Each structure stands twice: as C-alpha cells, then as structure tokens.
From Swiss-Prot:
Region (Interaction with TNFRSF1B): 54-79
Boundaries of the annotated transit peptide in chain numbering: 1-31
Protein name per Swiss-Prot or TrEMBL: Xaa-Pro aminopeptidase 3
Residues bound to Mn(2+) 1: D342, H423, E450, E474
Pfam families membership: AMP_N (PF05195), Peptidase_M24 (PF00557)
Spans through the membrane: none
Length: 506
C-alpha cells in the first residue's frame, strides 16, 4: 500500500532521535527479567481469546498468538529503559507512562465498526478490549527500567455482557497479560493526584489521543495542570515507535505467516480472474481466500484496479468490469494475529501479457529486483528510493517513453512513479509513521519495496502502446545481517509463472 513521499513531522522526530543516539543498542541488548509469575486464567470466556478457551490459537503463556507474556514484559522493560535515557538531565524523580486503548467507533446508530485496538497499547500489553488504560509506573527506591505495570479496564457487567459479549475483568486482565495489577477503569481517577505532583514526569501522547473520551475525562485536565510546571507532559509515541522498528523473532514469524497466506490468496485470485471479470469479484475472492486461511481481517481496503484505473494510485472503488486484454493491479494485504502483509501484483486477466504489457512489466520487475538487493543493514529507504529513480529514468529512456538528459530522466521518473519506493511494515501497514525513511536499516526492520510505472491513457508524451498501462510490484522484506528475507516470496511475479497460474484448469 502506497504512502506519501514525505511528511511534515520528520524534522522534530529526527531531532528527538538524535537525543536517542546509541539507543538502537538498547533494542538489541540482552535484558534479564524476573520470571513472570504464572497466574491461573479464569475458566471462562474473556474479552479476547485465551489459552483456556482457544487452545487452537494460543499456547499456555501466550497473550496473543505466538507472543508470550515474557515478550510483552520485555517490551515494557525496553520502553522504560528508553524513558530513563531520554529523561536524563530533566527534573523529576518519578516517571509514569500512560497509554490509552481505542474506543469502539460507530458507522451509524448502534452499528459499530469492527473493533481494532490502538497498536501502541496493543504492542505493550496485548489487551484487546476497548475503553482501557495501561500505566507503567517507576518503582519508588528503584532505578528505571524497574517499574510496575497496571491496567485499568471496564468492570464486568452482566447486563452489557449479555449484549456485547464477555469482558475480561480485572482478574482476567492480570492472568492473561501478566501485568502486575488491574483495576476497574473508574479507579484511574485516584491515580491522578500523584501524577500531578511536581516530582512526577508523565509520558503521554496528548497531541493525538487515541481515546477522545478518556482523554477528556482524565488526561486533558492533567496535561493542562502540568503545562506550567517544570515537568510538562512529554510524548512517548516516538519511543514506542523506536521499539517497534525492530521486530523480534516471534514477530517476524507472525509476519511470515501473514505473508504466506496472502501470497496463497493472490495465487487463487489470479486463477479466478477470467476475462471479462468484475473488480468486485476479485476483491471478494481475495478477501475470502485470506480469511479462509486464517486472516483476521484485511489490512486495508485493497486496490483492485483494472485497465487505466491502475493509474489512480489509491483506487478503491473496485466496481468496474475489467475487459479482455486489460491488466489488473491488486494491492492487498491481511492482518493475522496483530501483524500485517502488504503485497502488490499486476497481471493480465485473460492470462496472457501483450507485448507492450510484458515490456513495461519486465522493466518494473527488473527495477524491483535491483532494489531488493539493496535491503541490507546500513542503507536506508531513502537510499533505495534514489536508486529506484535512477534505474527508472534509464528504463523509461530504454522504453522510448522519455527522450531527455540524465537530469530530466530523474525528474521524469518522479512523474511516472509519484510515490516512494516503500515504507516500514509491522502491526500497521504504514508502520511507525514518525520514523524517518533516512534511518539506516537494521536487522529486524521490515519494509516494503514497491516500484511502479504509471502511464495514463491521456499521456500523449508516451508511446501509444503504453498508454493506459499501470504496473506495480510490491514485496515485504525483513532486513537481516545476511541476504534479505522476502516474506512474500511465495507470491508469483515472473511473467511465465503468472501466465501458468492464470491458464491452469483446476
């Protein structure tokens, strides 16, 4: 899924990251944690799957599929280590991190959207109920990163649970997530006087609160009260995103699963695209194949763009017929166990590339393969983007689409590919959006590589045979110390492979 070339938030973020110089080692350092006390999970349905009620999804000790209480505790520990580093030189002897969950959002009266947890909240505790608060509080007499983790959760309510399903309650929240304590949500107000103290530095994202009501009830008054103190409320989001950049082995395994099942869904969708075909049918086929293989939801509304519509980068209407002889560009991904995939393929719906289609497709494929070889430690997405533009300028000249100097070819490349080469990937499609693309890549980072060439049918500068063609090829890549690990490697992209799949009989 494409993202914009730049964002105005980068300058302050880069400044903050300079203050964290050396903190990448914090992410890779070995930590010694006290064993997480094992607490018996209630033998009842909670507000989310548990090892007791869903043993086919979770093993004992896991909070979410594949991710244990120990992993979540380590994340909180690392976050408090970053808080400790950034707080040096500031007054305040106590530190409290506050992270809000998402609320339920409604599409119309009494009709909710499918609930999706705030990913920063989810990353730190794995709790998947709305209207909750996570608090990480430094321990008196102990140095950070020692802390106490607390959840404030909705109280169990038989009346509401009759309609909305079970809630975990405080006992379920503690046993499932492994936090130290849990309290009913309304008791958070009793913590506020301590947070207002001059000696307490509060870390909370007051500029973009994830839960408007909880912010208004609790955190906005606190933020305003501390605005004139020496210890103003400080943002924690950039620290959380700094952690989320580097995926653990368990996270990479979840992303491998998402990549594999999405690749299989692409294969089945390619096979089903017999011309003429409705974009809506391919949308439905792709979603079905993802869900049938275990995906929770699609990661985003997919682009299913036939013919000239592939030149609309975020085309999501998906309601037109794709004619015989046209290609379809499908940009789609799924979410599986909190982690997402993001893959794009372009293919002819009748199963055979025309000569101009194959010519343009092979050019994009060659650029994409060259960019994949650059996905190694020390380079950056910006470096790869610059290389993509250089290669694309040359390819556009080779194809006869442009006839200009080297400098003009670089400019033309931006015309025919107006988006970046990729973005970070993880729990979000456009993961860790405050992290600049100029950061050196490190082992454990996951990125997309997605060059494309788009030639609208009204572009009279291009040869007529290419007009109306749009091609993008996107893979998901784990940066390793050795060669890149392609999470979407099972998704065909060679011309011969695509044509064989589209022409198979069963």
């Amino acid at each position: 899924m494409l993202s914009l070339l730049s964002t105005p938030r980068l300058v302050p973020v880069i400044a903050r990251l300079r203050g964290l110089s050396g903190c990448m080692s914090c992410l890779q350092r070995r930590y010694s944690l006290q064993p997480v006390p094992v607490k018996e999970i209630p033998n009842r349905y909670l507000g989310q799957p548990s090892p007791v009620t869903h043993p086919h999804l979770l093993r004992p000790g896991e909070v979410t599929p594949g991710l244990s209480q120990v992993e979540y505790a380590l994340r909180r520990h690392k976050l408090m280590a970053l808080v400790h580093k950034e707080a040096q030189g500031h007054s305040g002897t106590d530190h409290t991190v506050v992270v809000l969950s998402n609320p339920i959002h409604y599409m119309s009266n009494d009709i909710p959207y499918t609930f999706h947890q705030d990913n920063s909240f989810l990353y730190l505790c794995g709790f998947q109920e709305p209207d909750s608060i996570l608090v990480l509080q430094s321990c008196s007499g102990k140095q950070l990163p020692s802390h106490k983790a607390m959840l404030f959760v909705p109280r169990r309510d038989p009346g509401r649970e009759l309609w909305d399903g079970p809630r975990s309650g405080t006992d379920g929240a503690i046993a499932l997530t492994g936090v130290d304590d849990a309290y009913p949500l309304e008791e958070f107000q009793h913590l506020l006087p301590k947070l207002r103290a001059e000696t307490n530095m509060v870390w909370y994202d007051w500029m973009k609160p994830s839960h408007a009501q909880l912010h208004s009830d609790y955190m906005q008054p606190l933020t305003e009260a501390k605005a004139t103190s020496k210890n103003k409320v400080r943002s924690v989001q950039h620290l959380i995103q700094h952690l989320r950049l580097i995926k653990s082995p368990a996270e990479i395994k979840r992303m491998q699963i998402a990549g594999k099942l999405t690749s299989e869904a692409f294969i089945e969708t390619m096979f089903a695209s017999k011309a003429p075909v409705d974009e809506a049918f391919l949308y439905a086929k792709f979603e079905f194949e993802c869900r049938a293989r275990g995906a929770d939801i699609l990661a985003y509304p997919p682009v299913v763009a036939g013919g000239n519509r592939s030149n609309t980068l975020h085309y999501v209407k998906n309601n037109q017929l794709i004619k015989d002889g046209e290609m379809v560009l499908l940009d789609g991904g799924c979410e599986s166990s909190c982690y997402v995939s993001d893959i794009t393929r372009t293919w002819p719906v009748n199963g055979r590339f025309t000569a101009p289609q194959a010519e343009l497709y092979e050019a994009v494929l060659e650029i994409q393969k060259a960019c994949l070889t650059l996905c190694s430690p020390g380079t950056s997405l910006e470096n790869i983007y610059s290389m993509m533009l250089t290669l694309m300028g040359q390819k556009l000249k080779d194809l006869g689409i442009i006839k200009t100097s080297k400098e003009s070819a670089f400019k033309a490349a931006r015309k025919y590919c107006p988006h970046h080469v990729g973005h970070y990937l993880g729990m979000d499609v456009h993961d860790t959006p405050d992290m600049p693309r100029s950061l050196p890549l490190q082992p454990g980072m996951v990125i997309t590589v997605e060059p494309g060439i788009y030639i609208p049918e009204g572009d009279t500068d291009a040869p007529e045979k290419f007009r109306g063609l749009g091609v993008r090829i996107e893979d998901d890549v784990v940066v390793t110390q050795d060669s890149p690990l392609i999470l979407s490697a099972d998704c065909p992209k060679e011309v011969n492979d695509i044509e064989q799949i589209c022409s198979r009989t069963s």
